[in-house]
Amino acid sequence: MANQKRGRQSFILPDPPVITHWASVAGKKESEGPLAHTFDIKSQDTYFGQKTWEQGEKQMQKLALGKLAEKAGMKMDDFDLVFSGDLLNQCIGSSFTLRNLGIPHLGLYGACSTMAESLLLSSMAVGGGFADNAVAMTSSHFASSERQYRFPLGYGGQRTPTAQWTVTGSGAALVRSDGHGPRITGCTVGTVTDLGIKDANNMGAAMAPAAYATIKAHFDDMKTAPEDFDLIVTGDLGQLGKEMLLELARRDGVSLGGKLTDCGTMVFDNDKQDVHAGGSGCGCSAITLCGYLLGQLNGGKLKKILFCGTGALLSPTSTQQGLPIPGVCHAVCIAGGT
C-alpha cells in the first residue's frame, strides 16, 4: 500500500531526507549577476579549460561534483547514487562526467526541470530506504544550448524579446538520511502539459501552464496553500512566463501574490545584463537552489519553500517538424535547516 502517497500526484516523506551539502559552478555572465556571492566556483572562461563548449559543460558537472565531495568530506566511492541530466543530446554532459567513477548513475531528461526531478528522485531513494545518500545534479551551457536548439553563435541571429538566456552553470546537492540541513518533506510529480505553443523563443509561455498545474496539484494533494510557504520558486519561466503563471492562478481564484518568484528573474540583473525575458536552462534553477536558496534555508532566513522546476520538452527535431512544445514541472517542498 502506498502509505506515503497523497492525492493524485504527491507524496510525503515521514522521515524527511536532509540536504546536507550543495555546490554550484557558474559561468562568466552568471558571476556578474546579483547571486554571484553565493556560487562556489566562478569562471571567466566559457570553455572551462576544454576544447569545446560541450566538453566545458561536462567539466562544470565534474567541478560541481568534486566540490560537493570536498564540502561533505566524502570520496566518490561514498556516493550511493547519482541522479543527473542536462540539455545536450543523449545527456552526454552527465554521462561523460560520471564515466569510470564507479558511481551508480540514473540519467534523467526533464529539460530544465531536471534539478527538481533529480532532487525528487533522490528524496524517494533515500526516504524509501534504498540509499543512504544520493546526489542530485544538472547543468546547462548558453553556447551549447544555442547551437543545439536555435542557431550557432557565429550565425549572429537576433534574439526576440520573449527569448531567455540559457544559464551557464551546474549545481549538485547531496541528499542523506541523516545530518543537518534543509529537509525535503514532500514532492509533487508533474504531468506533461501542452497548450500548443510552438515558438522555441518563448519557452516561458510553454512552461507556465505546466507550472500552474503542478502547483495547484500540490496545494490540492497536500491540503496546503500559498500562505504556508515563504516562497514558491519556479525554475525558469522568466519574466513573461511568471506573469502568465500569475494570470492562470488569478483566473482560478488562487492568489500567489508576493510568494511567487522565479530563478530566471533572480539569477541575472536584467537592467544591466540584457537577458531579455530572463534566465533559463537546467543550470538556472540548479545554481539558484545550490547557491542562494539552500543557503537562505540553512541560515534560517527562509523557513519553507516550494521549489518547482519547469521544463520545456522540445527537441531540435520536434521544432523543425513544427510540433508544439510540451511542458512539465516537478515540485519539491523544502523546509529550513535543523
Please provide the spans of the model-predicted regions.
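Active-site-adjacent elements of ketosynthase-type condensing enzymes
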Residues: 86-102, 142-155, 241-242, 288, ...
